[in-house]
């Protein structure tokens, strides 16, 4: 109310790791006397899928730092690895470093390059002078959006380049890493490999 800005803040809490029980929960649905429609709804909610976790080494981060040097992505189509043209991480992903989204000192705490890599396209920078400025500004914007707004399929996909590159493990090619709010930190690994030829959201972002 009153058009005051709303920001998300990270809080310590415990959560049940439902994914660890996904197979058991789904298998046990066959042992209970529920209507087929309800069991189908439960299976959709559990959302178990078959796939592979792929690790991309990350280059471009400034030497020492607490940020991880590997990005993990989950894919149901490992055969599309050769078609990955970029990667996208959630604004809250620890590879970026930083503080809670929207904090004034977020830019200084980001573990990103201090200058744009040579050949960076202007359209990737969000009009910022450095990757840290671009990502800090984008994280502040993303923190003011609800999860429903972020995953709205009708919304124009936005994002900025982080200055980092993931190394494709199958061919050794570097692929740029972007930050975008349509990727959620609480879903999967909080990072995706983007294959525009096989995914509508990746195509829209590209």
Question: Where are the regions that the model predicts?
Answer:
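NTP-handling and nucleic-acid-processing catalytic cores
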Residues: 1-205
């Amino acid at each position: 109310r009153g058009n005051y800005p709303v920001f998300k803040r990270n809080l310590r809490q415990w959560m049940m790791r439902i994914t660890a029980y996904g197979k058991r929960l789904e298998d046990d649905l066959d042992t209970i006397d529920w209507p087929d429609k309800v069991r189908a709804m439960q299976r959709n909610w559990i959302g178990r899928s078959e796939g592979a976790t792929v690790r991309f080494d990350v280059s471009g981060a400034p030497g020492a730092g607490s940020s991880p040097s590997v990005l993990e992505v989950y894919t149901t189509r490992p055969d599309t690895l050769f078609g990955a043209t970029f990667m996208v991480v959630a604004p809250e992903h620890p590879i970026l470093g930083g503080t809670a989204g929207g904090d004034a000192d977020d830019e200084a705490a980001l573990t990103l390059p201090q200058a744009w890599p040579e050949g960076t396209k202007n359209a990737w920078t969000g009009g910022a002078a450095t990757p840290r400025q671009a990502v800090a500004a984008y994280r502040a914007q993303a923190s003011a959006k609800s999860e429903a707004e972020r995953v709205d399929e009708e919304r124009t996909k936005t994002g900025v380049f982080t200055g980092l590159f993931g190394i494709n493990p199958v061919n050794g090619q570097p692929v740029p890493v972007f930050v975008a709010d349509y990727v959620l930190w609480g879903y999967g690994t909080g990072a995706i490999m983007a294959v525009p030829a096989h995914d509508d959201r990746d195509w829209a972002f590209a």
